């Protein structure tokens, strides 16, 4: 039996998700940041920021050659090149804790791991499940599509 309150629950869940992600979709192209914004990018552990979003982070947002993890200027590196998804998970968890400790900052997560590292949004987005309810983390549309 199909009950109308099931329809309402489905609608409310969708509406809640829409409210949750409102204003929290990372722009597909970022060439400038507000003072409190941080560009979150996929890196390698060696911190060789030579291509993709890592190169943008180095050239424009303060990423430091030789530093593959964490806050650097107005950027935050999450290593994605060292192996499978499970090797990325602890760095994403560390990032989420950092973001939680810094509510004054707004983190713009790029589609980390989905460029040079070769993963799909379906692989990486679930790692950001806990970020869904954090108002100071924006996620790429492709990640929202997976975790909503």
Task: Show the residue positions of the predicted features.
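Acidic, Ala/Val/Gly-enriched low-complexity intrinsically disordered segments
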Residues: 5-7
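Macrodomain-like recognition of ADP-ribose-binding/processing modules
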Residues: 9-148
């Amino acid at each position: 039996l199909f009950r109308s309150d099931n329809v309402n629950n489905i609608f409310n869940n969708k509406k809640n998700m829409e409210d949750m992600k409102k204003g929290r979709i990372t722009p597909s192209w970022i060439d400038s940041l507000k003072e409190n914004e941080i560009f979150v990018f996929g890196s390698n552990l060696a911190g060789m920021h030579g291509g993709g979003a890592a190169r943008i982070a180095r050239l424009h947002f303060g990423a430091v050659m030789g530093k593959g993890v964490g806050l650097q200027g107005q950027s935050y590196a999450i290593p994605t090149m060292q192996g499978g998804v499970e090797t990325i998970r602890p760095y994403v968890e560390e990032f989420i804790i950092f973001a939680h400790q810094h509510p004054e900052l707004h983190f713009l997560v790029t589609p980390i791991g989905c460029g040079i590292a070769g993963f799909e949004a379906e692989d990486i987005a679930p790692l950001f499940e806990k970020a869904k309810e954090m108002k100071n983390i924006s996620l790429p549309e492709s990640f929202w599509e997976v975790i909503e």
